């Protein structure tokens, strides 16, 4: 089978992956990470950590003995406290597609994130964070019936966790960047002040313009700051403009076709 090297199935919010370390002794991966950050800082480079707080590597009891469940992350401690659940107490994959969406109605789950950010900032020395599917951190599952999916999907700009993270960033002089969408919604421009946001509108408009799609007005709007979408919660200085990322095709492929063909082999 294929090896999962993507890095988006978080097992622990506090530990670097031992597989990437040369020194695999007790504490070795942590020491190496700290040394790496120090070396980058000495060269004048900041380090931003891509963090996945929307789900964990928690699995289920499928694909094996149905009477046996393996706990790999938070499920063995207090699954009902950390995870969104259906009325029948099954894990939810709605916003993440991973069957283990975290529940940020829970103060315990909120504190876990804040403690993790403190650890990576104070102990490991990173300069900022990019939050994968950050909209999950702005939802309040417990404010709706467990089967009321319309209300489950609501996003709260003033969510206490989003506000606390922005305050933490200001206090520690670090940057926090949201991937401001998930499978339940697109919230670019809606994060509170103190957050920067990946701008998917900029990405899409520039890609289309480069291909000659004729979207000149849209292109000019995003290149000039996307003011219409960022005016309310901090202004266009919040937008993180990008064209390509780890998800999807590389930049050369993006401008080398006329019609999409996702079935073509690599």
Model-assigned labels for residue ranges:
Residues 1-125, 130-165:
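Substrate-binding/active-site clefts of carbohydrate-active enzymes
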Residues 142, 147-152, 156-266:
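Conserved alpha/beta catalytic core and glycan-binding cleft of carbohydrate-active enzymes
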């Amino acid at each position: 089978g294929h090896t999962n090297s993507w890095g988006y199935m978080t097992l622990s919010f506090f530990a670097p992956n031992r597989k990437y370390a040369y020194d695999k002794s007790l504490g070795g991966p942590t020491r190496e990470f700290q040394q790496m950050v120090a070396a980058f800082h000495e060269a004048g480079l900041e380090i931003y950590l891509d963090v996945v707080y929307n789900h964990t590597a928690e699995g289920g009891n499928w694909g094996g003995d149905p009477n046996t469940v393996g706990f790999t992350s938070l499920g063995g401690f207090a699954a009902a406290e950390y995870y969104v659940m259906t009325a029948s107490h099954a894990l939810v994959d709605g916003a993440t597609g991973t069957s283990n969406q975290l529940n940020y109605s829970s103060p315990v789950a909120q504190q876990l994130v804040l403690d993790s950010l403190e650890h990576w900032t104070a102990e490991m020395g990173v300069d900022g964070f990019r939050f994968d599917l950050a909209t999950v951190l702005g939802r309040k599952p417990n404010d709706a019936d467990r089967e009321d999916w319309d209300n489950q999907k609501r996003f709260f700009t003033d969510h206490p966790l989003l506000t606390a993270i922005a305050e933490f960033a200001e206090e520690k002089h670090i940057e926090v960047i949201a991937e401001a969408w998930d499978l339940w919604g697109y919230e670019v421009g809606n994060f509170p002040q103190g957050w920067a946001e990946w701008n998917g509108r900029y990405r899409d408009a520039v890609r289309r313009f480069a291909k000659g799609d004729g979207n000149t007005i849209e292109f000019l709007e995003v290149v000039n700051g996307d003011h219409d979408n960022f005016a309310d919660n901090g202004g266009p200085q919040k937008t993180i403009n990008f064209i390509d990322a780890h998800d999807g095709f590389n930049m050369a492929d993006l401008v080398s076709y006329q019609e999409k063909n996702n079935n073509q082999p690599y």
